[in-house]
Structure formats: structure tokens, C-alpha cells
Swiss-Prot record:
Gene3D superfamilies attached to this UniProt entry: Glutamyl-tRNA reductase, N-terminal domain, NAD(P)-binding Rossmann-like Domain
Record comment regarding domains: Possesses an unusual extended V-shaped dimeric structure with each monomer consisting of three distinct domains arranged along a curved 'spinal' alpha-helix. The N-terminal catalytic domain specifically recognizes the glutamate moiety of the substrate. The second domain is the NADPH-binding domain, and the third C-terminal domain is responsible for dimerization.
Catalytic activity: (S)-4-amino-5-oxopentanoate + tRNA(Glu) + NADP(+) = L-glutamyl-tRNA(Glu) + NADPH + H(+)
Superkingdom of the source species: Bacteria
Biochemical pathway: Porphyrin-containing compound metabolism; protoporphyrin-IX biosynthesis; 5-aminolevulinate from L-glutamyl-tRNA(Glu): step 1/2
GO MF annotation, one: NADP binding
Originating species: Vesicomyosocius okutanii subsp. Calyptogena okutanii (strain HA)
Protein purpose: Catalyzes the NADPH-dependent reduction of glutamyl-tRNA(Glu) to glutamate 1-semialdehyde (GSA).
InterPro entries xrefs: 4pyrrol_synth_GluRdtase (IPR000343), 4pyrrol_synth_GluRdtase_dimer (IPR015896), 4pyrrol_synth_GluRdtase_N (IPR015895), GluRdtase_CS (IPR018214), GluRdtase_dimer_dom_sf (IPR036453), GluRdtase_N_sf (IPR036343), NAD(P)-bd_dom_sf (IPR036291), Shikm_DH/Glu-tRNA_Rdtase (IPR006151)
Listed name of the protein: Glutamyl-tRNA reductase
E.C. no: 1.2.1.70
Binding site for substrate: 50-53, 109, 114-116, 120
Chain positions of site Important for activity: 99
UniProt-annotated catalytic positions: 51
Length: 416
């Protein structure tokens, strides 16, 4: 019997150096979905890849989905199982249902209740839909997760306090520079995280902000909103020495900022310190950059303490959110129980249509060669009734007395 299964590598167990090894870049995701969908016993699949988690959601009838998914993840990223085994989380059936709802509502996020994950989950869903790797069960699962997340947002205060990775990034920079408004900030990338950082920095009255991105039009959109300068990604190395704060979040598959570049920038700055925050997965900044004097390099994992300092207000709403998830999951499980019945009814109706069409075609031919319309129509109706009721009648006769009452409940509806 098929089941829902999830393999997860996330911030709770895996450090950034592991997460970046198993991350999927957007340009390779469609092929990755196709490869996974091609594995025997995988009926449907979705892949979520963010800075804090890589998760594979499948509907499968493999005997050991965990083994299949773990081997797939290791093979596609060309790493050994030993490298990732200690960091794997696996969920199936009810646990999988709870987990996907926890993810969608932000209860499983590094930042409790953060809203960005829901958008990322929806993007993963739409990517799978475009790749044609969904089926009815996985479609229903994700629609359920989305509606549950909406209900949690509506019925609780979990998203009220301004705690997000972008917010905490700006808070962390304030630990290095007391007055952000006097600093020059370089933001690399043009995704949602960078746009949120720009928004928070703008609220801190930062007037000298540079947005660098591979597609300069996307950088320009953010720059226009916050009176910033926009440049292409190839140009950022020529202005990096001007930046007191650098926050990077691109989808690059290899680091774009190396130790040599920063050494050169520090010389031009006469070793004035630089705060650098790498919130990309895989990382945008080589770890060796952090060895340099006057460089304060942080990764997304270093945000945890800032997050904990600001999380108190949301923690109170967590229990209420979990209660909502439990109630919503009961509704989904009820749908899951009757799913085989839906498939049986669909099959029965399809078979009935085949019988009807065959007999109808025969009756039409007879009418063309005979004027006895009434007898032909009566014969057609009798044959159709007999053929449609043959198998159900046979099954009712073979049904035990104990189960007969269930059949009797359906019979009156036939008269309607």
C-alpha cells in the first residue's frame, strides 16, 4: 500500500556545511524531480530546498522509502551515505502529515512562526506541478498544509512579533555597528530574504545601500523601493571595499566571495572592520574569510542566539497552533480513509460507461435497420440494468449477515 514519506536534512541536526552539500539549486531542481519520479515505486514527489532545510516529500509503495530517498540524495549530490546519515530525519504517514504542517506554519523553522517558509513551500509545490511529478494524494497533502498554515496565521498571534531571518540579520549587525544609518551596506542577491533585509535596513535609516544581483533588473526593483543603488553581480567586487556591512543570499552553487578579494578590500579600507553575514545555502562566502582580522563573518547558524532573544512572544502561541494542526489533520485522515472508496467508485463508473456505450452502439444500429423503436429501447434498458447490477448482486449474495446492514444502507439511494 502506498504511503506518504518525507526525508529531511534541516537546521535542527545538520550544520550549514552539511546543508549546503545537499542543497538543490533552482536550475537543477526540475531534473532532480524527474530523476526522483523515475525511481520505481515513487508515484509523486516534491523537493523543498531552502537555507535551513532540504526536504523530499513522496508518495511511495517502496518497502523501505527511507533507504531509497537517502540513496537518491547521496547519489545526486555525489556524496557518501556516511556523510549524511547522522543528519537525516525521516517521517511517514501520520508523522509525515504533522511534519509538513509544522513546516508550513513555521513551527519547525529556525525562526518560530516565520512566514517565508510557506512561500517557499508553495514554490516547491508549483515547481513539482510544472514538472508533472504530483498525484492526487500529494496535491491534497500540500493543499491541506497550506490551508492549515492559513488557519494558524488567522487564529493565533504566532506571526505578530517581527522575528525573521532578515530581521535577525539586521539585529546582529547592530551588535557590531551601533549606528547603522552611518554605514554603507552591500546586499548581494535579489530574493525575498534580501528584499526583507533592505526593508529593515531602510527602517534603520540606512541611506547608502547597494543591491548587487546577476539579473540587474531584479536588483533595480528592490533599489527603487528603498532609494538604493543597483549593480550587476560582476561589478560588486569593485565596490566591496566601500561596504561596512555585507549580507549575501544568492543561489550560486559555489562561493562568490573569496579570501583574496576581502584581503584586497581590507587594504583599501585601511583595515576598517566589515560585518559579513552569509545566509545563502550553499554558502556565498568562503569560510576562510572569517580568519582575517577586522572581519566579522557569520552564517545563518550564528543567528540562533539573536532569534532566541526575540522569540518569547511567539512561543506562547505555539501550543495553540499545534492544537489547530491536530484538528485539521483529523479531517485529512478522514479523507485518506475514504480515498480507496473514491478510486473504486471511479473504476466502477468507468466500467459502467464502457458497458453503456457498447449497448448503446448496438441499439442505434438496430434502430437504423428496424422501425420497432419501443422494443429496442426496452431491450436496451433491460440489458443495461442486468449488466450493471450483475456484479453488485453477486457480491451482496456472498456478503455475510454481519456486513449486510452496510449494504442495505446504500440500497434506498438507488431509488433516487
Amino acid at each position: 500500500m502506498s504511503q506518504i514519506a518525507i526525508l529531511s536534512v534541516n537546521h535542527q541536526l545538520a550544520p550549514v556545511e552539511v546543508r549546503e552539500k545537499v542543497a538543490f539549486t533552482p536550475d537543477k531542481l526540475t531534473q532532480a524531480l524527474s530523476d526522483l519520479h523515475g525511481i520505481y515505486g515513487i508515484y509523486a514527489c516534491i523537493i523543498l530546498s531552502t537555507c535551513n532545510r532540504v526536504e523530499i516529500y513522496v508518495n511511495s509503495d517502496n518497502e523501505n522509502p527511507k533507504e531509497v530517498l537517502s540513496n537518491y540524495l547521496a547519489k545526486i549530490h555525489n556524496i557518501t551515505r556516511d556523510r549524511i546519515n547522522p543528519y537525516l530525519n525521516y517521517f511517514e504517514d501520520n508523522e509525515a502529515l504533522t511534519h509538513v504542517c509544522n513546516v508550513a506554519t513555521g513551527l519547525d523553522s529556525l525562526v518560530l512562526g516565520e512566514p517565508q517558509i510557506l512561500g517557499q513551500l508553495k514554490n516547491a509545490y508549483h515547481m513539482a506541478k510544472e514538472a508533472k511529478t504530483l498525484n492526487k494524494l500529494l496535491e491534497k497533502l500540500f493543499q491541506h498544509a497550506f490551508s492549515t498554515a492559513k488557519k494558524v496565521r488567522t487564529d493565533t498571534q504566532i506571526g505578530v512579533s517581527p522575528v525573521s531571518i532578515a530581521y535577525c540579520s539586521v539585529k546582529l549587525s547592530e551588535k557590531i555597528f551601533e549606528c547603522l544609518s552611518e554605514q554603507t551596506v552591500l546586499l548581494i542577491g535579489a530574493g525575498e530574504m534580501i528584499e526583507l533585509c533592505a526593508q529593515y535596513l531602510n527602517k534603520k535609516k540606512v541611506s547608502n545601500m547597494i543591491i548587487a544581483n546577476r539579473t540587474i533588473e531584479n536588483a533595480q526593483k528592490i533599489a527603487n523601493l528603498y532609494q538604493a543603488q543597483s549593480i550587476g553581480l560582476k561589478q560588486f567586487s569593485s565596490v566591496i571595499h566601500k561596504a561596512d556591512i555585507i549580507i549575501s543570499s544568492t543561489a550560486a552553487s559555489v562561493p562568490i566571495i573569496g579570501k583574496g578579494l576581502i584581503e584586497s578590500a581590507l587594504k583599501k579600507r585601511k583595515h576598517k572592520p566589515i560585518f559579513m553575514l552569509d545566509i545563502a545555502i550553499p554558502r556565498d562566502i568562503e569560510p576562510e574569510v572569517g580568519q582575517l582580522d577586522d572581519i566579522y563573518l557569520y552564517t545563518i547558524d550564528d543567528l540562533e542566539q539573536v532569534i532566541n532573544d526575540n522569540i518569547g512572544n511567539r512561543e506562547k502561541e505555539k501550543n495553540l497552533a499545534q492544537e489547530i494542526i491536530i484538528k485539521q489533520n483529523q479531517v485529512f485522515n478522514q479523507w485518506l480513509k475514504v480515498l480507496p472508496n473514491e478510486q473504486l467508485v471511479r473504476s466502477y463508473r468507468s466500467n459502467a460507461n464502457l458497458i453503456k456505450n457498447k449497448l448503446l452502439e448496438k441499439a442505434i444500429k438496430q434502430i437504423k435497420h428496424s422501425g420497432d423503436y419501443e422494443n429496442i429501447i426496452r431491450k436496451f434498458a433491460d440489458q443495461l440494468t442486468n449488466k450493471l447490477l450483475h456484479l453488485p448482486s453477486k457480491n451482496i449474495k456472498q456478503t455475510s449477515t454481519d456486513n449486510l446492514s452496510q449494504c442495505e444502507g446504500c440500497i434506498p439511494n438507488i431509488k433516487k
